[in-house]
């Protein structure tokens, strides 16, 4: 497989057909465009398709250490991949792992303390940041309803409204599917 170099799964597993298509598309972009130097060292770990409201979004997972490099070319990459996959929205998310909460009373003497970056809260916040890139999350409000359910209102940078406003429904659906949390996105006027 030629695209095997672009999809490197954890544990050395073989990429499935859909991941193969994504890998092939990224490889073609590397061959044909001026993105070659930036894309040469980059690879993805997995990809999946998420359906919502009769539309589809493609979620591409990238290794966290290579994420900064991906973000340098992400706007171009997303535009090209969306063209190739007939208008499906494409989002890049860092491949992160959540470690379970340590149990009370159980001590494992050779176990390290769980780092903050592996907690559920940190991972979910990072997914949110990755999802809305290139916009920035400038604020967050969590509304707890009387029945105990939570609605997260995320305030995004007003300067990026024109570039990502059409994708807000996609972001909401993808975040709900990945984390199970309801979220709404707003572009508030900046406070002075």
Curated annotation (Swiss-Prot):
Single GO MF annotation: structural constituent of ribosome
Species classification: Eukaryota, Metazoa, Ecdysozoa, Arthropoda, Hexapoda
Protein name: Small ribosomal subunit protein eS7
Similarity comment text for this entry: Belongs to the eukaryotic ribosomal protein eS7 family.
Domain of life: Eukaryota
GO cellular component: 90S preribosome; cytosolic small ribosomal subunit; small-subunit processome
Protein keywords: Ribonucleoprotein, Ribosomal protein
Gene Ontology process terms (BP): ribosomal small subunit biogenesis; rRNA processing; translation
């Amino acid at each position: 497989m030629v695209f095997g170099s672009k999809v490197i799964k954890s544990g050395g597993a073989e990429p499935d057909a859909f991941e193969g298509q994504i890998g092939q598309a990224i490889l073609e972009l590397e061959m044909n465009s001026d993105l070659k130097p930036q894309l040469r060292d980059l690879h993805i770990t997995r990809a999946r398709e998420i359906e919502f409201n009769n539309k589809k979004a493609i979620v591409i997972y990238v290794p966290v250490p290579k994420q900064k490099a991906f973000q340098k070319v992400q706007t171009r990459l997303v535009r090209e991949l969306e063209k190739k996959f007939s208008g499906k929205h494409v989002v890049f998310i860092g491949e992160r792992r959540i470690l379970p909460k340590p149990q009370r009373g159980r001590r494992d003497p050779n176990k390290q303390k769980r780092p903050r970056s592996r907690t559920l809260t940190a991972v979910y916040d990072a997914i949110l940041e990755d999802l809305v890139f290139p916009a920035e999350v400038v604020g967050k409000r969590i509304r707890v309803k009387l029945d105990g359910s939570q609605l997260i209102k995320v305030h995004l940078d007003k300067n990026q409204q024109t570039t990502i406003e059409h994708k807000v429904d996609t972001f909401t659906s993808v975040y709900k599917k990945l984390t199970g949390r309801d979220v709404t996105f707003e572009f508030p006027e900046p406070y002075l």
